[in-house]
Swiss-Prot record:
Cofactor note: Binds 1 zinc ion per subunit.
Chain's role: Secreted metalloproteinase that allows assimilation of proteinaceous substrates and probably acts as a virulence factor. Catalyzes the hydrolysis of elastin. Hydrolyzes azocasein, synthetic fluorigenic substrate Abz-Ala-Ala-Phe-Phe-pNA, and His-Leu, Ala-Leu, Tyr-Leu, Gly-Phe, and Phe-Phe peptide bonds in the B chain of insulin.
Temperature dependence: Optimum temperature is 60 degrees Celsius against azocasein. Retains 50% of the activity by incubation at 60 degrees Celsius for 1 hour.
Induction comment: By Zn(2+). Expression is controlled by the prtT transcription factor.
Maturation propeptide residues: 19-245
Residues holding Ca(2+) 1: N364, L375, D378, D400
Positions bearing the site annotation: Important for proper folding of the protein and catalytic activity: R470
Binding-site positions, Zn(2+): E245, H429, H433, E459
Cofactor dependence: Zn(2+)
UniProt binding sites for Ca(2+) 2: N437, R438, T440, G442, N445
Protein name listed in UniProt: Extracellular metalloproteinase mep
One biological process term in Gene Ontology: proteolysis
Amino acid sequence: MRGLLLAGALALPASVFAHPAHQSYGLNRRTVDLNAFRLKSLAKYVNATETVIEAPSSFAPFKPQSYVEVATQHVKMIAPDATFRVVDDHYVGDNGVAHVHFRQTANGLDIDNADFNVNVGKDGKVFSYGNSFYTGQIPSSAALTKRDFSDPVTALKGTTNTLQLPITVDSASSESTEEKESYVFKGVSGTVSDPKAKLVYFVKDDGTLALAWRVETDIDSNWLLTYIDAKSGEEIHGVVDYVAEADYQVYAWGINDPTEGERTVIKDPWDSVASEFTWISDGSTNYTTSRGNNGIAQSNPSGGSSYLNNYRPSSSSLSFKYPYSVSSSPPSSYIDASIIQLFYTANIYHDLLYTLGFTEKAGNFEYNTNGQGGLGNDYVILNAQDGSGTNNANFATPPDGQPGRMRMYVWTESTPYRDGSFEAGIVIHEYTHGLSNRLTGGPANSNCLNALESGGMGEGWSDFMATAIRLKPGDKRSTDYTMGEWASNRAGGIRQYPYSTSLSTNPLTYTSVNSLNAVHAIGTVWASMLYEVLWNLIDKHGKNDAPKPTLRDGVPTDGKYLAMKLVMDGMALQPCNPNFVQARDAILDADTALTGGENQCEIWTAFAKRGLGAGAKYSSRNRVGSTEVPSGVC
């Protein structure tokens, strides 16, 4: 927002800020531009066509754990001199592809931005992989032995001073944890939880390896991992931000905002497979309010970090019906309806994503995973009418096992003001940040959409999912859609162009990214490409307008849900911090894994139309476009 790195924020064009929004917390109070500290994209992706590695015959078909051995042997073959560890978040997706993630180590410490992901097919062979391992010289362990580096408190103070964090560290002290060179800080004020520090290595922009402290500070509007040089205690090498800006009377699923329909009363809307405890239980406690296994929704007028004791409506009869009118004012007068709408939209999206493969083992957001894999205790904290800002929204995605946090704001660009919780596309956009961050790089690593281009694609995936869900029964490929039109009170929405298959209406192509340096603008290009994929698949397979897909052998039978499924499967295949070309290849690979490549022509044609054809080349400053479709594909 305003040029600051607020990953997951919805964002607006500059013109929307003619009347600046009030900001009360976090980085919005400062002038430090965190974009300067974004991590660089280091990974390469070897797609399924390029991967011709045979797994040992004894592993085909693989047993429940043998895919880890296949992946490990592959890493040893590609990087024979590297030391590494297996990240404990591997799983087999519902398309039959296993995902295993590795972290490179040096002298017993993690190289925090050196990752390797291996995707193993159902036949027990390596399907594709991504690699950002460091290949340069590993430094001597002498610095560690002699402890020739700054102490963690110095690192915390250096981080706070350089980034101008609104926290007080004068009385900070550090306590060691059970992990090697890992500390938690006490005596710090202004943070949601005690800051942490861990000694790691970090691959710098110039390709060299630096010893660094990874300092974690959650200050509500920003949840930061700061890599500060362990010797100087001042130079910052990179920053990751986890924040990416019964009977229910609601706008039903598929109604994007109040201009598209009326509120209705919906009874027991949960999916009993995706939400086996319903939406208002966590398996041990049954609630009579907007709290359950998938989310907890409440009012947050102060904009603070506390939520458990915040106000939420309660009904002993489980009748969550509260008045709302678009002409009502102030927004606090309809807070009950706002909380229930937010709770409904987030929960029903959870259930849809579960059906499409975002399950417990894939790192979804649930308090109780009920023995289905993954880590629990991480429902989504859903703050309605959050007082920490206006005219926006954001989502914080920490690693699996820690709650996601969505902040929905009031929009002040109309009279009366409008509440973002009543525009489903905004809620879906924010929740999708949690989806894309958990799937890319694995559930245990939330650092994999932090480069400029990958962060842009994060915004694009969020817009795409919101738009796909918004489609109406009578829509055709000539139908255009905007983002945030109702909440912002802007006829053209909050993006540069509407999403359209017309190059006249929306002329964005791959090379448009060369002139862009903001994630939301880059995301509009990516989502425009995915909108082309969506309609090519709908033209081939038809469109299911029901709130859930029909699956045949795990494959959606229609084009809309198939496109959403392939996009999600591609997230799990692609490397950490991918670029457009790699993400395109991952979607093509997802189709190969799911359908045997039945839709390669439609996918290639869609990407080629907007310049991401077979000859497209990535460069951070001079991307080369291509409208070429590979021969023999169509």
